[in-house]
Amino acid sequence: RVPVAFFHHFLEDWTDFGKGIEDDEVFEKNIEGHRIARKLFDPDVAKVMNDSLMLMPVEASFVKTAADLRKIEPLSSGSGFMKRTLELTKRVREIYADSDAPVYATSFSPTLVLRSALPEGRRPGLGGPETVIKRFIKEDPEALGEACKTVSEGIMELNRLLIKECGVDGIYLSVNNQAGFFPEEIYRTYISPFEKAVLDDANKLSDVNILHICGFIGQGNDLNLFTGFNAAAYNWDVHTEKVSLSQGKRLFGGKAVFGGFEQKGVLYKGTREEVEKYTYQILDEAGQVGTMVGADCTVPADIDDSRLEWVRQAAIRYAAQPIRKIKYNSESLN
């Protein structure tokens, strides 16, 4: 049968995100959330949720002009953030020590880190004018690219440690260009080369890295921007992009795909029968080879985890049946 996996955050208060470097209570709550979640639903694939350490705190408060971007430095492996991230990952990895499930570490693209670090920055998708970076795009895109390269160096160093020292099986790299925030030429020239570099570097240590093309809160991406990324599997917002799993398989050269459920749709509020029916629809449309069933993004933190088991049981029953006649097309899932 296909593997089934869903991920959700463990900190209910968004203001606690990123406080784990200094706040032990928030840090411990983040770790303990994995233990509690596993008792409720033991996934076929696990991911370390680093809520308390989102996002990498690159120092960029001094940036006032595009030229200042060239002064940004990569985060040191001896930083408090790096040390806490390694501790969190090792301890969460221990929670899954007796599991056969591969365990992934969450990683974010250089631009996501940079946009969050700038004086007017916001976590993309959470609002904020971001007028500073928009001005930099126009004034000196090369400086923006140089900053992305610098930030990527710290990300790559952390990812190497996560794989080699913490024992994670791969990196789950989150990227996006939601709503065309960066013009296509800018993205392809100054942004994506360093996202690819992060992924390619991780590929030297693991052959199961996943690319998550984040469509958070319904803001879409042009998936064609990501066809040149060399991931083992791809996850995107099927419902926002209007690109089904089978269509994604073709778009990404036959690579494995992950997802299918809208996180706040039938999975969150449907009956068991509706959830099971939708699981069958996903598998009828995408097939079982090269497919992992999950969601477009993280599911709501308050979801009833028994619903996730409904999906797995449906996948088990689906696999046990004789070859099914395809009843659904991709449009029925949108």
Language model features with spans:
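Active-site loop segments of alpha/beta catalytic cores
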Residues: 1-11, 16-21, 33, 44-48, ...
